[in-house]
Amino acid sequence: MGLTGPEDIDGHDKWIVDMWHDTVRRNDHIYVLGDMIMSDRTTTLYLLGRLKRKGVKIHLIIGNHDKSTYNLTNMFESIDYIKVVDFRASVFDFLPCDLTVAMCHYPMKSWPRKPQGSINLYGHVHANANWIDDGDDLCLNVGLDSPFANFRIVSLRQIADWYSTKLNGLTPREYIEQASIINPQYIR
């Protein structure tokens, strides 16, 4: 395997589809943080059709290798460069608290609702982002070839577990104040 799975494009795309079918359940919402399919438009349409067979809702956060997905808006629930999603503990009982996630293909130094304890999920940098994730910021590389994902699709439960460990018993506000990563005047 190379940085993004098998060495050739066809092998990569087959690997993604096989993993998808082994992991994703009917009606799941899947957030793809870019570089989804690296094939031509015809192959992309075929592969997206195979992925959508399970009735999943695919949200694409555009990456630098997503040219073949341009103008395929009917294949996605949403297409964004940055997507912010609120997950409620009342809906997902495994969440330690309500969780806001700001997703982008690229790591961000500042992201929406960071002062309130939101998480930045990103990909793009492959396995080369430990210097970003090891700090106090609430950002996490969830790219398939990241150490966190370990060549598997990451679930909300895994992200919630990481968040709980990072907070270490604190509320998001307490964590932000204690970590001193935000000037206190910006915390609401």
PLM-predicted stretches and their roles:
Residues 1-87:
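Core catalytic region of metal-dependent phosphoesterases/phosphodiesterases
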Residues 15, 21, 182-188:
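Non-catalytic interaction surface on structured domains
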Residues 74-186:
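Conserved beta-sheet core of the metallophosphoesterase superfamily
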